[in-house]
A protein has these predicted regions:
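Histidine kinase transmitter module recognition
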Residues: 87-88, 121
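Residue-level detector of short coil/turn "hinge" positions at structural boundaries
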Residues: 16, 51, 55, 93-94, ...
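Helix-rich catalytic cores of soluble enzyme domains
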Residues: 1-87, 99-116
Length: 248
């Protein structure tokens, strides 16, 4: 993300202050996600100052689809609630919640209302809007933020030293690194070390979803020539879910 943002500093010359919108997904690793967002803002401001750019970053944060599930779908509400909490405490400027049924239902009033009400509960009943930067001063979060920032800065410098983001993107290096990380997480899930309740642990074998699908909830691939090999969005539970659907 930061290496990508740097390409704007390299190629866009503007005298007036600008705002760069960064779209970030968050998962259920609660404190990690809080620290991740804080580290992104910290490093963005650091890099912008090094480029003598008076730019601000506007963080648009949304829950990831990576850990969302088709079966026992109500658990998705719990996942998105903690993810939105992380987004708030991490300093997100805008939060776009994900409806619990977004994987298999078309946009609908009920799913959208639940997603909206989750944020309203955090605001009006948990009072998340009453304190600015509520995670400031927490030793654990501050320490984790600094650790993530240090590691991210090393990775950023490595990308810049090897030609920058666009060069590595064109050469497939960025895609390969992301794929390697995704494969490691998938292996953990397949081995039962990464848990999704209701899917690979405590699954309800009586759940039936085949006749509720309004949308195709799995990876779609349409082979065609591209300048850059695309990064394909894929959820952890797809293989298990496909096997269960075939048995219904």
């Amino acid at each position: 993300t930061l290496a990508h943002a740097t390409e704007y500093f390299n190629h866009v010359e503007l005298s007036k202050p600008q705002t760069l919108v960064l779209e970030i997904a968050v998962g259920t690793n609660y404190f990690f996600e809080i620290a991740k967002l804080r580290a992104i803002r910290l490093l963005f401001n650091l890099i912008a100052s090094e480029y003598n750019q008076n730019w601000n970053c506007h963080l648009v944060v949304t829950p990831t689809k990576r850990n969302k599930t088709l079966y026992d779908y109500n658990v998705n509400m719990l996942r998105t609630t903690t993810e939105c909490m992380s987004a708030i405490l991490g300093g997100a400027d805008t939060i776009a919640n994900l409806p619990y049924d977004a994987l298999y239902h078309k946009d609908n009033e009920f799913g959208d209302r639940i997603a909206r009400n989750q944020l309203l509960i955090l605001k009006n009943e948990s009072y998340f809007d009453k304190v600015n930067n509520p995670s400031d001063g927490s030793y654990y979060i501050e320490s984790l933020t600094q650790q993530l920032a240090d590691k991210a800065l090393v990775l950023f410098k490595d990308i810049e030293a090897n030609g920058g983001f666009l060069k590595q993107l064109n050469e497939g290096i960025i895609k390969r690194k992301i794929q390697e990380s995704a494969d490691k997480e998938q292996d953990l899930f397949d081995a039962g070390k990464e848990i999704l309740l209701g899917t690979n642990k405590h699954a309800n074998k009586d759940d039936r979803m085949k006749h509720d699908l309004e949308l195709f909830p799995f990876v779609k691939i349409k082979p065609r020539k591209t300048l850059i090999t695309p990064i394909i969005e894929k959820r952890l539970a797809e293989k298990i879910e496909q096997e269960r659907l075939e048995k219904e």
